[in-house]
Regions:
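Active-site C-terminal subdomain of aminotransferase-like
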Residues: 14-15, 190-287, 291
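Conserved active-site segment immediately N-terminal to the catalytic lysine
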Residues: 178-190
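Active-site phosphate-binding strand-loop segment of PLP-dependent enzymes
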Residues: 115-171, 184, 192
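Conserved beta-loop-alpha segment that forms the PLP phosphate-binding cup at the N-terminus of a helix
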Residues: 53-82, 86, 90-95
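Conserved PLP-binding catalytic core of the aspartate aminotransferase-like
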Residues: 295-328
């Protein structure tokens, strides 16, 4: 990969210059009062993006460190968990549950297809589960499941906690954490938040804190025990704060500087405007792809605002396609996963790349590679169709670029 390639993969994402510049600071000790206040402010901003009043816990590492910490903090040996699978990434939760001595029971749904709530309801009625998990935005299929709130209600009706993997949706798709009553909502820096790889976070409900504190068998995970980060009373209050959030481990200071700036950009744009921008650019990209005679893997009503999985025409190998895309057009992205590893590519349109310039450039490059591989289509069809989508949107409201 070259330094001037455009990252159109489903994470990591390109990073705005503002965010990169925010890290260019002298070394600082994370336990100073000054940094503690910065830490608190950053987590308050993150809670706004989560749309929650719950406490958000930052976990150093990738998104998987957040998933593992959340699960190991609540699951004890022998506990049952219902794991909803609608793509590759749901399986991670099952592995973690089993790894700490729990019993994961998977319920599988076809990639890119609707969930059958009746199946989930029947499964929950068959036994006692401590936890239900699912992925909000399945990066492997390009499907977003806004039915997560309905799944949360089913979980709570049967006495279970609800964990939502929002790794590739937070900051790019509407995620009403409190309205859906999500108990453990996991995300990370390097997807739609558009900050550097290295931090995950978990928004934790009071219900989940109570389960952690009521464990019969203590959490064996020292690093990932979320109770280390539980807010403690601050007496006397400082600057109006009555609680202090401890740092369970030393915070990655410069990653926090970057995260703070990325969150500042999100809140400056406004959540509603940001979600609309992602939806528009995702629509333009998908319509362009369809104009080439291709169909995204996810059905239209589940189409993700942050990532699209595109099965290639018969006989075209993903590895060859991606090589042409990068070497000849400077677009770096990733192949499909699971059964689509060799036959599909995935394009991320999130964060700073969810803009017309990146979408149109990527569509032009995909057209050129398909033509080189002998796929028949009307030249310019993808770019022209995407431009039509943007033009139609302009009549409603101008398309806004993202400041760098």
């Amino acid at each position: 990969m070259k330094t001037d390639d455009i990252l159109m993969c489903p994470g990591p994402n390109d990073i705005a210059d503002r965010v990169l510049r925010a890290m260019v600071r002298p070394a600082a000790c994370p336990v100073t009062p000054e940094f503690q206040e910065f830490y608190e402010q950053t987590l308050d901003m993150l809670a706004q993006v989560y749309q929650t009043h719950n406490r958000v816990v930052p976990i150093p590492g990738s998104g998987r460190s957040g998933v593992e910490s959340a699960i190991t903090s609540v699951i004890e040996p022998g506990d049952r968990a219902l794991v909803i699978i609608c793509g590759t990434f749901g399986h991670l939760a099952a592995r973690v549950v089993n790894g700490v001595g729990g019993q994961a029971e998977e319920v599988d749904f076809p990639w890119g297809e609707l969930l059958d709530m009746g199946v989930i309801r029947d499964k929950l009625a068959q036994g006692t589960y401590k936890l239900v998990t699912m992925v909000h935005n399945e990066t492997s299929s390009g499907a977003v499941y806004m039915s997560a709130g309905e799944v949360a209600k089913l979980a709570h009706a049967h006495g279970a906690l609800f964990l939502l993997d929002a790794i590739s949706s937070l900051g790019g798709a509407d995620l009403p954490t409190d309205a859906w009553e999500v108990d453990l909502c996991v995300s990370c820096n390097h997807k739609a938040i558009a900050a550097p790889i290295g931090h995950a976070y978990v928004a934790v409900s009071e219900r989940a804190w109570a389960v952690m504190e009521g464990r019969q068998d203590p959490c064996r995970n020292i690093f990932g025990n979320l109770l280390q980060w539980k807010a403690q009373p601050l007496d006397p209050p400082v600057d109006g704060r009555t609680l202090r959030r401890p740092q369970g481990v030393f915070t990655a200071v410069h990653l926090f500087y970057a995260l703070h700036e990325a969150l500042t950009m999100i809140l400056e744009e406004g959540l509603e405007a940001r979600f609309a921008r992602h939806l528009l650019n995702a629509q333009a990209f998908r319509e362009g792809i369809k104009a080439l005679g291709l169909q995204p893997l996810a059905r239209p009503e589940l189409a993700s605002p942050t990532v699209t999985c595109i099965p290639l025409p018969d006989g075209r190998r993903a590895a060859d396609f991606l090589q042409h895309l990068q070497k000849e057009h400077g677009i770096f992205t990733l192949p499909g996963l699971g059964p689509y590893r060799d036959t599909a590519i995935r394009i991320g349109h999130m964060g700073v790349t969810a803009i017309p310039r990146c979408v149109l450039h990527t569509l032009y490059a995909i057209e050129a590679v398909l033509a080189k591989m002998g796929h028949g289509f009307v030249p310019g069809a993808a770019v022209n169709r995407a431009e039509q989508v943007y033009a139609e949107a302009e009549t409603r409201e101008p398309v806004k670029a993202v400041a760098s």
